[in-house]
């Protein structure tokens, strides 16, 4: 089973950024949330799409930020951002996004 299949089966938005804060991957739910296709924004800095993103902070301090309540462009949501470490190398971040509508369902 491929990781993309697993990520797209999850009902929460998933965003993966590299160590430079550029978008590497997001699942279908996150794409619907931001109204973009991955192919159109891959390798662009997340701050171009989400200026208030906390990804740069997690990249800088290499510590997770959990359960941030955000409201951007009329979208209210919770986000948790975690550093990605592989073989003791810091590789970027993974963000989990839950919209208020998803909580109420």
Describe each PLM feature range.
Residues 1-33:
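Sensory modules in modular signal-transduction proteins
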Residues 83-105:
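Sensory coupling linkers of modular signal transduction proteins
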């Amino acid at each position: 089973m491929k990781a993309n299949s697993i990520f797209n089966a999850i009902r929460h938005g998933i965003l993966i950024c590299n160590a430079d804060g550029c978008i590497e991957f997001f699942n279908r739910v996150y794409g619907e949330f931001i109204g973009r296709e991955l192919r159109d924004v891959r390798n662009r800095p997340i701050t171009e799409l989400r200026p208030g993103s906390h990804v740069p902070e997690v990249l800088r301090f290499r510590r997770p930020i959990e359960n941030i309540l955000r409201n951007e462009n009329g979208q209210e949501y919770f986000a948790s951002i975690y550093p990605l470490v592989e073989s003791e190398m810091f590789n970027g971040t993974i963000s989990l996004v839950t919209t208020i509508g998803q909580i109420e369902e």
